[in-house]
């Protein structure tokens, strides 16, 4: 029996119960209780939690079967079934379930608007040559002319809260332009900064994932204290559009960044790249052209990969557990009925894919050399998926990579990931390694 199926039950008595409830007052306790229970058991989040265990079991069964097959691709790193992998996969599945808010499911008008705007964007991008040359869609920002900083603390960690005006605007004539510019809070860029006494020390720009944008989460996710105190780096963590203080009051962090409205996602990613590049220009300005590397996690891995295809002179680019294809994620994580209607209205399909390509790190070519590109990902990632990371790794000409036997959110507890990132920063000249320690050991078994 599926959770929430109407008419399902051991005795088949629910239709009679429903009929009895209909004749009662709408506000009577039995009716209220029944409706509340029905909402709970049909809520996609409840259904998702109930299905997390079976989904994990199915994944582990597939993993076991694949582990017994001959490995045809010498570059493939098959996952090995283990209790630790199962726990991390289950954690991913549970987290995915909590993100399936029924309030965010598209309505008929949303499908229609999204389909019309995709068609308009496709025609505009084709006419202006952006489909043939996606790089020409993007403009180059400068350092902010005016900025402000104030000292703050998060979980005992002092940092500077940097803010400046984001000068990004969608191109004139782009669908969704006016809607995007109406989001006032989003027009101020923010970043959490840990500066060395010498601003000329190298910088690492760390781009957070979807739904965060709070200093206590972002600084912890990147182990910013270690980057700053042990590796001797200046650290800047930009807040992505529609996240944290850039979101409208009363709206969850990240809401609207990835939705049925693909043109909003295009604007969000284009602005992400613009603002991160403005932050890099600022770091170079105050750091007297100090070297700058970029490291992103999840959605931040997507943005870091995008910036690596636009920004000259980066010391390194590290894509961690990266998302690389938004439409593929939409296909994967949306209910079948939503996917079907989106395809029917043109919100998904060939034109949508062409529109997405102007902000795709799988289409744009990275500007930095292969030895300065790095990828790490979990073989059991149920959110961004290891497949998306593998596509980026291939597009980046198979640079140094670390595959770990875990899920999306479990990277933080994997020691080999921490060593891999340290080695990347050391090998590119951003750091001499942890204070008083020799450089991190090579992960040659993970390199190709």
Q: Would you name each region that the model predicts?
A:
Residues 296-300, 304:
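Gly/Ala-rich beta-loop-alpha elbow adjacent to hydrolase catalytic centers
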Residues 305-351, 403:
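Hydrolase active-site cap/lid region
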Residues 329-388, 394:
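The feature captures the conserved acid-bearing segment of alpha/beta-hydrolase catalytic domains
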Residues 287-297:
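Alpha/beta-hydrolase fold nucleophile elbow
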Residues 201-209:
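Short beta-strand element of the alpha/beta-hydrolase
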Residues 1-176, 439-448:
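N-terminal targeting or regulatory segments adjacent to alpha/beta-hydrolase or S9 domains
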Residues 208-270:
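Cap/lid segment of the alpha/beta-hydrolase catalytic domain
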Residues 407-418:
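Catalytic histidine-centered segment of alpha/beta-hydrolase-like enzymes
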């Amino acid at each position: 029996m599926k959770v929430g199926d109407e008419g399902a039950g051991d005795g088949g008595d629910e239709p009679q119960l429903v009929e009895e409830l209909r004749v009662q007052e709408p506000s009577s306790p039995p009716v209220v209780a029944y409706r509340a229970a029905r909402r709970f058991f049909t809520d996609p989040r409840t259904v998702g939690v109930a299905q997390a265990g079976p989904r994990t079991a199915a994944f582990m069964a597939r993993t076991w079967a694949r582990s017994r097959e001959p490995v045809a691709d010498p570059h493939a790193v098959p996952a090995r079934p283990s209790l630790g992998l199962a726990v991390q996969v289950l954690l991913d599945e549970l987290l995915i379930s909590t993100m399936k808010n029924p309030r965010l499911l598209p309505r008929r008008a949303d499908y229609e608007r999204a389909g019309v705007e995709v068609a308009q964007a496709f025609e505009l991008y084709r006419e202006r040559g952006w489909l043939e040359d996606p790089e020409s869609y993007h403009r180059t920002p400068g350092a902010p002319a005016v900025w402000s900083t104030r000292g703050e603390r998060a979980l005992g960690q002092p940092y500077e809260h940097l803010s400046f005006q984001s000068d990004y605007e969608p191109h004139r004539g782009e669908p969704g332009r006016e809607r995007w510019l109406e989001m006032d809070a989003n027009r101020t860029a923010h970043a959490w900064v840990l500066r060395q006494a010498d601003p000329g020390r190298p910088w690492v720009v760390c781009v957070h994932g979807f739904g965060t944008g709070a200093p206590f989460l972002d600084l912890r996710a990147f182990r910013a204290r270690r980057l700053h105190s042990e590796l001797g780096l200046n650290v800047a963590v930009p807040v992505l559009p529609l996240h944290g203080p850039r979101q409208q009051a009363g709206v969850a962090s990240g809401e609207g960044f990835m939705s049925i409205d693909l043109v909003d996602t295009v604007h969000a990613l284009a602005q992400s790249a613009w603002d991160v590049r403005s932050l890099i220009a600022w770091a170079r300005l105050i750091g007297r052209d100090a070297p700058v590397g970029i490291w992103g996690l999840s959605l931040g891995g997507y943005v870091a990969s995008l910036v690596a295809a636009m920004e000259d002179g980066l010391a390194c680019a590290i894509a961690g557990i990266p998302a690389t294809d938004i439409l593929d994620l939409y296909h994967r994580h949306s209910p079948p009925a939503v996917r079907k209607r989106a395809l029917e209205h043109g919100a998904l399909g060939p034109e949508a894919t062409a529109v997405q390509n102007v902000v795709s790190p799988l289409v744009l070519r990275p500007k930095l050399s292969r030895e300065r590109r790095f990828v790490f990902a979990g073989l059991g990632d149920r959110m961004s998926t290891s497949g998306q990371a593998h596509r980026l790794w291939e597009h980046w000409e198979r640079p140094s990579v670390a595959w770990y036997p875990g899920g999306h959110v479990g990277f933080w507890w994997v020691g080999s990931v921490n060593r891999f990132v340290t080695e990347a920063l050391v090998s590119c000249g951003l750091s001499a390694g942890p204070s008083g320690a020799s450089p991190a050991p090579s992960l040659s078994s993970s390199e190709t």
